[in-house]
C-alpha cells in the first residue's frame, strides 16, 4: 500500500501522542512458556529455559504546566523459543575425519553439555518526546526513538554446536523535530525534519578476523570417517 511504499523509500512520518497536563501511565508484563510430553523431539524444554516475556511501559505528563510536556514509551521482548540444542561443541572446536587411517581422526568436544535455546529473539524499543507550547498557535516538539533487535534462527546442523549459528541484528535510531503553526481555525502548516540511522548485520563474531572462527573445510561432512 501507499504507506508501505513510503516507508520503503525512506519517507517516514512518525505520529505520537503528546504528554498532557496530568500524569498518565501504563505498565504490563506478559509471560509465557512451553510444555510437552514429546521430550525426545523437543529436547531440554523447560519453563525456566524457554520462557518468553513482554514488558510494556509508558508515561506522560507535565514538566512545566501545559507549556512543556513529555511522553515516553518503552517495550522489552524476550522470546526464548521452543527448540533447543545441546552444547557438546564450542565454536572454536573442530573435527577432522579426512584421513583413511582411523587412528588419525580427531574430534574436539569442549562443550559443557548444557541445553541452549536455538530459535530466539530479543527486542528493546524506546521513545521519548518533548512538546513545547509557549506561544499560542505554535507548537513544536522533539522526538528520539531507538530499537535494538537480535534473533537466531534454528539450524539443525548446529544442534550440538548451538553457539556456532550466526546472529542477526538490527539497530535503528530516529531523531525528529516538528513545528506546527495554527494561523487560523482553517489554515495551518507543519515543518518536519528527521534523521534515521539503521544498522544491519549477521555474524557469529562481529570481527570477521576473530581467531575463534574455524575454517569452512571443517564444516562439511566429507571424509572416510
Whereabouts are the PLM-identified features?
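Transmembrane beta-barrel wall of Gram-negative outer-membrane proteins
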Residues: 48-150, 170-189
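Flexible, solvent-exposed coil segments and beta strand-coil junctions
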Residues: 24-25, 30-40, 101-111, 121, ...
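Surface-exposed strand-loop-strand hairpins of Gram-negative outer-membrane beta-barrel proteins
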Residues: 35-51
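Outer-membrane beta-barrel pore domains and translocons
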Residues: 15, 28-32, 73-77, 145-147, ...
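A beta-strand signature from Gram-negative outer-membrane beta-barrel systems
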Residues: 1-28, 54-56, 64-67
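Short, P/G- and charge-enriched loop/turn segments at secondary-structure junctions
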Residues: 1, 43-45, 114-116
Amino acid at each position: 500500500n501507499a504507506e508501505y511504499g513510503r516507508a520503503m523509500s525512506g519517507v517516514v512520518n512518525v505520529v505520537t501522542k503528546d504528554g498532557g497536563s496530568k500524569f498518565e501511565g501504563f505498565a504490563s508484563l506478559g509471560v509465557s512458556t512451553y510444555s510437552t510430553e514429546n521430550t525426545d523431539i523437543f529436547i531440554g524444554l523447560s519453563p525456566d529455559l524457554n520462557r518468553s516475556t513482554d514488558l510494556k511501559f509508558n508515561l506522560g505528563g507535565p514538566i512545566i504546566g501545559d507549556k512543556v510536556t513529555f511522553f515516553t514509551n518503552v517495550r522489552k521482548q524476550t522470546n526464548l523459543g521452543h527448540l533447543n540444542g545441546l552444547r557438546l561443541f564450542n565454536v572454536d572446536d573442530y573435527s577432522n575425519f579426512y584421513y583413511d587411517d582411523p587412528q588419525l581422526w580427531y574430534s574436539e568436544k569442549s562443550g559443557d553439555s548444557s541445553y541452549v535455546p536455538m530459535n530466539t529473539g530479543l527486542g528493546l524499543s524506546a521513545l521519548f518526546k518533548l512538546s513545547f507550547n509557549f506561544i499560542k498557535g505554535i507548537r513544536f516538539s522533539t522526538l528520539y526513538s531507538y530499537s535494538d533487535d537480535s534473533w537466531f534462527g534454528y539450524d539443525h546442523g548446529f544442534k550440538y554446536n548451538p553457539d556456532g549459528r550466526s546472529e542477526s541484528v538490527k539497530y535503528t535510531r530516529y531523531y525528529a523535530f516538528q513545528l506546527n503553526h495554527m494561523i487560523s481555525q482553517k489554515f495551518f502548516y507543519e515543518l518536519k525534519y528527521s534523521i534515521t540511522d539503521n544498522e544491519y548485520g549477521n555474524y557469529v563474531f562481529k570481527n570477521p578476523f576473530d581467531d575463534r572462527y574455524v575454517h569452512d573445510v571443517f564444516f562439511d561432512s566429507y571424509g572416510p570417517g
